[in-house]
């Protein structure tokens, strides 16, 4: 754990351990997205307030990608070269790093109650429909 906190770059290829690992990151790249594999969940690092980068293959997380990009906390990169350039730019600018991270976190928490709001709306519609049938 202390080694990971001091390392400049940490690469993880694991399941179920990433959420906590994001806490020590400065910036996160979501794998399986530069190749056509659908990407990884960008909301987990965003919840930690980390800027999130990913490739164009985010089919499994389209809504999350759109929310992060709309907020300014996530960014699509077309290839590894562009990823490297973007990471260097963000890591060289602490204010940009912090701003992107805050925007990423805000995007997550603005959408956090979406399921609850949808359920309430559906319940209301069902109640109205039930009354009309009686």
Locations of regions flagged by a protein language model:
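Nucleotide-activated sugar donor-binding and catalytic core shared by glycosyltransferases
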Residues: 1-134
